[in-house]
Regions:
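Positively charged n-region of N-terminal signal peptides that target proteins for export
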Residues: 1-6
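Bacterial N-terminal signal peptides
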Residues: 10-17
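N-terminal active-site segment of His-dependent metallophosphoesterases
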Residues: 19-102
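Extended active-site neighborhood of metal-dependent phosphoesterases/phosphodiesterases
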Residues: 22-33, 90-221, 234-274, 278, ...
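Active-site glycine-centered loops adjacent to acidic/histidine catalytic or metal-binding residues
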Residues: 50, 83-84, 127-128, 178, ...
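Glycine-rich phosphate-binding loop signature in dinucleotide/nucleotide-binding domains
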Residues: 69-74, 215-218, 294
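Short acidic, glycine-rich surface-loop motifs adjacent to enzyme active sites
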Residues: 81-82, 86, 216-234
Length: 308
């Protein structure tokens, strides 16, 4: 009887731990200040991340809403796609699997369709899933597909699997596109990944980022990077009650066991997609420190499938 009560208390404890709310947070209306009508609107950014999964011959609900917003946007605007542009595993070679290629093409086309009435400029950056099909080769297939579809070389950054690239939006705004998967991935698996890049090691990457931030400290500097530096989602070690019951997000619950799996994930840092990972932590600490060289740095990221 004692042991039964003991296990019951453990189960209740795990359930209470999982009872956090991860709904979208809104600022109370009373705290919103008035924006001066004399302020000049320099540029508008429309952000979407992890948009690389849509039904065949259709768009996801998020992309439909995104397209509607872009249709009303003016010329001085940018649509920024924050990586993971193709689920589940990047752009395959058409010769290897026709079905996989058609699904990947569908997922990209659904995003490109959002730009049909858009008067501004689109920018795509890569995420970790975009590296999951032959690494650099799959990434370059995606890059070339987007460039060809949009008839422009100025739409996918950084190019050629390189880590960082600066894009001048206007005289007062600069965007720095960073491929965080370049930093996090196992380089031994991609021996040719830096052949087309001026930057060939991680330390030089940080030096270049520091230089760009300092040179543009008088301009609003947007760092577009797929992996977030801060997160209250699963990649940051925060799990909803649903994920405590089934870490994979499936239908069948695994109480206690599911929470144990999440605990191991949170404390081990085994996955370099999670903030607790040693290399991810290294990237985060250095990047956050460098961002403080300017008071005008804004971080924008995807990765987590939430608004935060």
């Amino acid at each position: 009887m004692y042991m039964r009560k003991h296990y019951l208390l453990i189960i209740i404890l795990f359930l209470l731990v999982g009872c956090a709310t991860y709904k979208t947070k809104y600022v109370e209306s009373s705290t919103v200040g008035n924006i001066s009508g004399d302020s000049e609107l320099l540029h508008t950014f429309y952000l979407i991340g992890d948009a690389g999964k849509s039904p065949m011959n259709d768009q996801s609900e998020a992309l439909k809403a995104f397209q509607k917003a872009l249709g009303k946007a003016g010329k001085n605007s940018t649509a920024l796609f924050l990586g993971d542009n193709i689920y589940p595993a990047g752009m395959p070679n058409k010769k290897d699997s026709t079905q996989a290629y058609l699904e990947a093409k569908n997922n990209l086309d659904a995003q490109l369709e959002t730009l049909s009435q858009f008067k501004g400029n689109p920018i795509f950056i890569p995420g970790n899933h975009d590296w999951y099909n032959e690494g650099l080769e799959g990434l370059e297939r995606q890059q070339k597909y987007i460039q060809k579809k949009l008839d422009s070389k100025e739409v996918f950054f950084p190019e050629d699997g390189c880590p960082i690239e600066k894009i001048d939006i206007n005289d007062k705004i600069v965007l720095i596109a960073i491929d965080s998967e370049w930093y996090l991935t196992n380089w031994d698996k991609h021996p040719k990944m830096n052949d087309k890049c001026e930057i060939k090691d991680r330390e030089t990457f940080f030096e270049e980022l520091e230089s760009l931030i300092k040179k543009n400290r008088d301009r609003t500097t947007i760092l577009a990077i797929h992996h977030p530096m801060f997160s209250y989602g699963p990649h940051g070690g925060q799990y909803s009650a649903k994920l405590h019951l089934n870490p994979a997000g499936g239908k069948f619950p695994f109480p206690v066991l599911g929470s144990f799996v999440n605990l191991i994930r949170k404390t081990s840092g085994a996955s370099y997609a999670d903030l607790q990972n040693k290399r991810y932590t290294e990237l985060r600490n250095r990047l956050v420190t460098l961002a403080q060289y300017s008071q005008k740095v804004i971080l924008t990221s995807g990765h987590e499938h939430t608004l935060q």
